[in-house]
Amino acid sequence: MRRFHILLLLGCSAAIFAAEVPGGRPPPGFTPSGKPLAPLVVAADQRALLASSDPKLARNKKLVFDFWRIVYEGGHMERAAEFMTPEYIQHNPNVESGREAFVNTIGKARPPREVAAVSRFPIIDIIAERDIVMVMWARKVRDREHPEQIYEMTWFDVFRLDAKSGKIAEHWDSSERWGSAGRPPGAEFFP
């Protein structure tokens, strides 16, 4: 549990990119002091991340992993009810709460396509504790001040599963408002 809370705290910090340094901002890929960012290490075998000595935690990880591949990436909104409660709570400021609202919003951006065996997004880790599953991703984005420059950052999605149904009941991520673009930063690099 301690590992989860530390990673969640670090994740929120990593996703907020607002450091200013004397003399200007360092280029993408560097810390505020000008040191190179540590390279992100993605999982070589995403399915290995689903393992747990606790069968409930393994099931929770698999449900979130399958939801992501089938519904979010695959665009199969007709299957959302298999994975999400009707009362799904959304903490992303760009999507309303409720399964139907998720389907309407995300479905517009993700037409159905073949479901991949693993996530098309590069996963760093999947961590589960109690009814919470957190997925850590590597993600490319353009620098806000220098759009021609691209850097890699971490992204975190946290899901709470309903104790009775075992389905996704709540979601958090570190998203800001998407603005006039109508899509998240880095969406052009989404697989």
Task: Give, region by region, the residue ranges found by the protein language model.
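Positively charged n-region of N-terminal signal peptides that target proteins for export
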Residues: M1-F4
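Bacterial N-terminal signal peptides
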Residues: L7-A15
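Short, low-complexity N-terminal intrinsically disordered segments enriched in polar/charged residues
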Residues: A19-E78, E82, P86, F189-P191
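Short beta-strand segments enriched in hydrophobic/aromatic residues
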Residues: M84, R139-V141, S174-S175
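Beta-strand residues in well-ordered beta-sheet regions across diverse protein folds
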Residues: H91, M136, A169-W172
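Exposed beta-sheet edge and beta->alpha loop/turn motif
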Residues: M136-S165
